[in-house]
């Protein structure tokens, strides 16, 4: 992992623990969305009958095969009576609100409110009936008329355990089902100028005619939408026509304050910028060589041929000047001494010379007028070319002084080097980027650190890498693999030729030891050994003859260099994955308190001396050396609801934190049947039993219905037998439970502290093979057994078995703007990419969606593998041909919408989509592709079903930092010295015209807090700044795994966790089970004749093993 740390934290989140998902069945649905009055949240005790599961397609909201009857959902103290069982008279099938309206033949004996009627053409009825979760319900229980929005007002009070314990057989509300979209060969729609009209609709869904779908997509923009008064805008045909929403005014809610930001005002120059094309022959790939050529050219010809201009060069094909050069095109010849040959130029060592031909040709004028217009808010598009020129100008001088990496610069002189272990060291540096903001041009400067390879003799590097004396015993095969992997591509210089320090790039290791290597030295076929050649030619006696040689050059002309004559060249960034110890060491180096970081940033700006930078002077760029002072507001925390049976029924968090003391989970899940497996040889059976008992008690105290004893005694097993142990224990438990109609609800697993691949293997087997949620606990926690740890684990277990820990009081009292007024679904989506160096691993996309309304607390998730480093989520919407059903539609959005409908009894009338992991350069592409997929998924469920969409990108990998205006004012900082949670900024350092804001929603723990940046790319719900900022901040207090507000909105966080988890599902080619066929290639529900691997970019992506149905319905990723 090429880990760059800017705020003392790595960019990924480690997933600590796991838990078995609660199955639906006798005694435990564990799911409690839409509680009955008086029901504190323990789900029904029996499973309702369901029709066969529908995988993938289906006709609209209604599954392909109808279910049986209208089940009941029995909570504690009330019940929901399903309507439309055997006697229900809906000839069209499904609830009346989903019937097509207006065409001949669409008669609705069941009635239904007109605003829920679909508007299909003739005969748009849905045969086949539907399971009870599709039927409208009579909500019986305590209290009054049905609340607005068509959803029962959940009741979170009442004595725990009052009534409802003995439930009639078969009376259960089904847990919402999720079907993983089958993996099929699907040609994703191209992101090209095709409107979301006839041209962009892929194949029509089977449930309506081809003509209807064509018409429906053509008219998306113009038709009124039945569930909202706002017209739906057509999906933009291309980036040329896209306009991101303008800022709807600035927010006013919250306590006003001033913060400082690491942005420095840059005065816009009034120079006349010119761009020239550069062609250098022979062509070289190294920017460093190109720059050396240009530096030499400017040194020689600046005053004689360039009119005294000092150009800025991007290292490739473009040169920029402040004013014109005295020619339109000119050719120069430049001679460079080859730095690969010699550095010292000592006696008798003549360096080779290389001749380069450079052609400089006028290309265009870079107009700064448009940039000024954009900054003033009078032009919509940012003139990227002008911004790029200014960026290149300000990077010119640091590039000559430091080692550039992306937009950052590093040097061993910018701070003390720190050893990271195994031949690596950290270098300090800074990030620099020019940005357009409301205050004008801004230079964003931040501190950064990254890993470099220590400039050691190769022998010493290898000894550090293997952590042993390599002269004692020969290298093993695994040692050789490790060395080869670490050194491939690394540049070394030879040390056995005095001042002649020629440089080479390592391509591999020899398979033989140095003493066994020989090669021809002349045309007559004379052969010499490497040892003999070095002794005779250089007088150098090789000592480590048992080690392999480094191989440099290519396979046709291999060149052998003994390790002991090579030294690693300084300044090479390590771009591969760091191990845990190295990450910890790098974190330690980079973790800075806010005050220290602020001082370092100011020192860096002062040290860079932009006022003396000859390139900045040439182009007329002036940089203010003071941090920007920015108006901010601190949003208040939301009040959180807990169960009425606890001593504290709600809580108002203080500085982003609260605790579970005297509180009970608002909906405690039920775990009647659980087991424990111990993979740690340090934990005795008695210790495992004691730990599990304490954990069970904590779960009970926290509000869960948790059996104190496991169904079987804890089993101790060896990590290498993980699959055998899991399956055997699961089978033993089910042999006991199945005859009684019960299921295993949870598996508690004790792991060694360093468990390698065990955690991932265990999760894969549990979640994709056994259908079991699991909770992993490390050995060190078993021995410590702290109350705080047990309480945190209980929070995770509860949501894994379908419970809720807390909900927003405002959600229950229907006071969340644009969420509480009508059924709203909130999505989170993320794509995680493989680590650098893993060239063929797929990227993993994850989408989660809220499954409860009005609470918006529970999120079901789906995951999918896609092409390597593909950022667009490919499986949001899919169309394929089925030999029996014709054109079938599916995909992650459709599955989650159906699941929401099943869980709440209502279709979403609003969509809020938080998308993580998108860089600014991908905004247009991601919006065009993914908004189109959302639209198509909705239209495939029901003709003209187009709920308004708000699409928000969440960014954490930016370099804006906010600091308190006065670090000594305790009222404006938290305990770590960071700004207060809830601090929001939407002025000065934000976009000149678009709808974006920075929100620091969490309290700092260590280091400097990084605010999340939210940028709205599409908004049909017409949020005000206050509404979206408050919603986002409040949601950050609903994260299930801790009693703290978190730094990014939970749906995006959950999507990240789900994607991270799914990487464990990719088995190696062989495992202890011998093959991968168990779930990947035989993806369940795949239509006959459809291949399981989707082809993306000519590379078949192996699909992930399918999640089991009962796992995907709960928050298994927590």
From Swiss-Prot:
Piwi domain segment(s): 746-1067
Composition bias, Polar residues: 220-241
UniProt keyword annotation of Transcription present: no
Biased composition (Low complexity): 25-35, 148-157, 193-219
Residue span, PAZ domain: 457-570
Matching InterPro entries: ArgoL1, ArgoL2, Argonaut_Gly-rich, Argonaute_Mid_dom, Argonaute_N, PAZ_dom, PAZ_dom_sf, Piwi
Keywords carried by this UniProt record: RNA-mediated gene silencing
Gene3D superfamilies tied to this protein: 3.40.50.2300, paz domain, Ribonuclease H-like superfamily/Ribonuclease H
Stretches the record annotates as Disordered: 1-175, 188-246
Composition bias type Basic residues, residue spans: 10-24
Key word Calcium present: no
One BP term from GO: regulatory ncRNA-mediated gene silencing
Bias (Gly residues): 54-92, 100-110, 118-128
Cellular component, GO, one term: cytoplasm
Domain of life: Eukaryota
GO molecular function: RNA binding; RNA endonuclease activity
Described function: Probably involved in the RNA silencing pathway. May bind to short RNAs such as microRNAs (miRNAs) or short interfering RNAs (siRNAs), and represses the translation of mRNAs which are complementary to them.
Family membership: Belongs to the argonaute family. Ago subfamily.
Protein name as annotated: Protein argonaute 1B
